[in-house]
Amino acid sequence: MDHTIFIWNVWSRNEKKACMLNFHNAAVKDVKWSPQGHFLLSCGYDCTTRLVDVEKGLETQVFREDQIVAVIKFHPDNSNIFLSGGSNGHIKLWDVRTGKVVHNYNRNLGPILDLEFTMNGKQFISSCDVSQSNISENAIIVWDVSREVPLSNQVYAEAYTCPCVRLHPFDSIFVAQSNGNYVAIFTSTPPYRLNKYKRYEGHVISGFPIKCNFSLDGKKLASGSSDGSIFLYDYQSSKVVKKIKAHDQACIDVAFHPIIPNVIASCSWDGSILVFE
């Protein structure tokens, strides 16, 4: 909320703060590493997305919008393009080489909550805040990237919004964190059906923007919870395999280490970050 991005040295017991970036003029909403790890992409309440060369500590590009930018996502195969979504419900595909919008995705949506590319990068999934009247049509939409059209807009008919969508690293499914206190499962190929017989439940959302993430091998799903706990689910059985009491306030995100499979990091509504082994 203080406009700052911190890069932390996970293993250092002394100099844990490796770098501090101050390029935004308002609170930061989302931060993503580029696939090669040389750049950081960040967005926020100043209605911009900013690309920073981490090694040089220099801002290389600014992408301006007429909305608070809430979520950003690099393309899985082409790090020169990324998606952005914001408070006005606008979704844009940007090219970092030109600094211009390549595609616009418009459908009178509410604020965008999350974005996720499919495995081949030809489609993406959006989740947005919706009114009760159109919740079955717009809560989760699968889009065609190049044609700018929805491939399916009635994926999730429950009366809940979904603050997080995540693609499985290998299987043809994606999951959505539902405000109904469960993680729903969908096929990531047409016709994008909800699995009505299996879900991940046990954690509590309580209106917090709580995220979930798959392990690198796809065998586990981790979710935060409003009671400050981390829930680890078995992917196949959907059963809770471990519950860790991590924070005093809501645990809003959990991430697996990109190389070391038994290391996870979590963050809390109170601003604290923990690493578990």
Where would I find each of the regions flagged by the language model?
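Conserved strand-to-loop turn within each blade of WD40 beta-propeller repeats
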Residues: 1-2, 43-46, 84-88, 127-130, ...
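Loop/turn segments within WD40 beta-propeller blades
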Residues: 31-37, 73-79, 109, 116-122, ...
